[in-house]
Amino acid sequence: MKTSQLFYKTSKNANKSAAVLSNELLEKAGYLFKVSKGVYTYTPLLWRVVSKMMNIIREELNAIGGQELLLPLLHNAELWQHTGRWEAFTSEGLLYTLKDREGKSHCLAPTHEEVICSFVAQWLSSKRQLPLHLYQIATKFRDEIRPRFGLIRSRELLMEDSYTFSDSPEQMNEQYEKLRSAYSKIFDRLGLAYVIVTADGGKIGKGKSEEFQVLCSLGEDTICVSGSYGANIEAAVSIPPQHAYDREFLPVEEVATPGITTIEALANFFSIPLHKILKTLVVKLSYSNEEKFIAIGMRGDRQVNLVKVASKLNADDIALASDEEIERVLGTEKGFIGPLNCPIDFFADETTSPMTNFVCAGNAKDKHYVNVNWDRDLLPPQYGDFLLAEEGDTCPENPGHPYRIYQGIEVAHIFNLGTRYTDSFEVNFQDEHGQTQQCWMGTYGIGVGRTLAACVEQLADDRGIVWPKALAPFSITIAFNGGDTVSQELAETIYHELQSQGYEPLLDDRDERLGFKLKDSDLIGIPYKLILGKSYQSSGIFEIESRSGEKYTVSPEAFPTWCQNHLA
């Protein structure tokens, strides 16, 4: 391709509204054009990168028996009502919904579990057809409340999604491991630093679930890593530092605490460490047909993990109760909530079980109790793991070793769904005895746009984008000074020779200074630059520079061999 033919535009100035580096550079380098909030045009330059990534995905998925198809973007509401997700998604405003001329409700696809199940249910008949792996690379729509960070959180997104159907839990697990391995190979080929972490399945499903997280300081997700094990902080199980508590129970006392509403102020008032305080939070659980308030007791020095609470209690959504809701439900103010005389169900994190002679509130303003003990003063609560992991906590999967905390960008997510969706759509098969059996399902997805943004975030430098070799839109830039007709003729010859050998050169034939062209090449992220400047004119030797700064001097005779070693 010649720059005179390529429809692109670079900019000297960054977009001031771009919140993250990847968004800034992708727009500045001519890869991305913003149409509206969370909606972007993928320019010809970016589509070259996308096409290469899609080819890598196809190669790895086809190698394990995947079959590509294309599912519709427009879904009728009845499909989603089969699984109850229409109500769940519409209540949160995540769906783009519309009605056709007959008044029937539809949505633009945020995911495709319902559609794929309705299809497979009609065509699947025999166990001999299993395991089955179908996948697509297509657009998804999600009405994000706060679309931001360019391709990292957009309203219209490009994804690969795979679906597997199996005859048993064992075969489902085998398919899960195959997809896990294939996804690993995809990200290995991209040369990204990533970790696979245990995750919460969220609204997709509650079975085994893992995320592929690209390590990046900008990452939206917090991940806990210990050795080879990792977990999203939403799902991380951890063992916090232990504390010694009194063995002898002391007499309980009521103490006036006017205006003391924070844990820190309470610790100062009683001159005790935070871990001797039982703090209580009120949360609102949302279900399809009701809302429920519960209280959660936590050790004073630790934070609650709301995702774990929602998962434990099978809630569709969860939030901390507002001050007004606390006063309405408990008749007291925030800061004075506790297990004593609590009118709502009381749960507590497992780390509160060893606590003795602790301080807690009693659901009355300006009043706390000291030397409170389970069993003697309170009925034991309903315990659960509601702890938010912190750096330094011990990892139970790697005994004796602490977690390190990193930020990451989730680029892929894999799930075992069991029979949650196949039951709803009666995705069944006949076994060898003619008996009807249920299918076991898995779902898997790679965020194509997110992965490209993660590449930029992780690899970019102060000169611009640094694409992995496997994704770069062109393999080498051929650059010369505008107006230098001798160098231009040579550049044309080299360009056509490289094209004939299957390489992807970009001939910068603009009437611009050589330095300007080299800066553009670095901004765009092309791996190599062939520079036809003064050095070549004086020596007849090609000067080549890699995007990382390595320099090569290559004779015209040795140039084909150099290309085989570096561009192939």
From Swiss-Prot:
| Keywords, sorted A to Z | Aminoacyl-tRNA synthetase, ATP-binding, Cytoplasm, Ligase, Nucleotide-binding, Protein biosynthesis
Q: Which InterPro entries match?
A: aa-tRNA-synt_IIb (IPR002314), aa-tRNA-synth_II (IPR006195), aa-tRNA-synth_II/BPL/LPL (IPR045864), Anticodon-bd (IPR004154), Anticodon-bd_dom_sf (IPR036621), Pro-tRNA-ligase_IIa (IPR002316), Pro-tRNA-synth_IIa_bac-type (IPR004500), Pro-tRNA-Synthase_IIa_type1 (IPR023717)
Signal peptide range:
none
EC number(s) per entry: 6.1.1.15
Q: Has keyword Cell wall biogenesis/degradation?
A: no
List, alphabetically, the GO terms of the cellular component aspect: cytosol
Name the source's superkingdom: Bacteria
Q: Name one GO biological process term.
A: prolyl-tRNA aminoacylation
| Pfam families xrefs | HGTP_anticodon, tRNA-synt_2b, tRNA_edit
Where located? Cytoplasm
Which one of the record's GO molecular function terms can you name?
aminoacyl-tRNA deacylase activity
Q: Which reaction is recorded as catalysed by this protein?
A: tRNA(Pro) + L-proline + ATP = L-prolyl-tRNA(Pro) + AMP + diphosphate
Give the transmembrane region(s). none
Record text on subunit structure and interactions? Homodimer.
Please state what the annotation says regarding this protein's domains.
Consists of three domains: the N-terminal catalytic domain, the editing domain and the C-terminal anticodon-binding domain.
What this protein is reported to do is described as: Catalyzes the attachment of proline to tRNA(Pro) in a two-step reaction: proline is first activated by ATP to form Pro-AMP and then transferred to the acceptor end of tRNA(Pro). As ProRS can inadvertently accommodate and process non-cognate amino acids such as alanine and cysteine, to avoid such errors it has two additional distinct editing activities against alanine. One activity is designated as 'pretransfer' editing and involves the tRNA(Pro)-independent hydrolysis of activated Ala-AMP.
Family statement drawn from the similarity comment of this UniProt entry: Belongs to the class-II aminoacyl-tRNA synthetase family. ProS type 1 subfamily.
Q: What is this protein called?
A: Proline--tRNA ligase
Q: What species was this sequence derived from?
A: Chlamydia pneumoniae
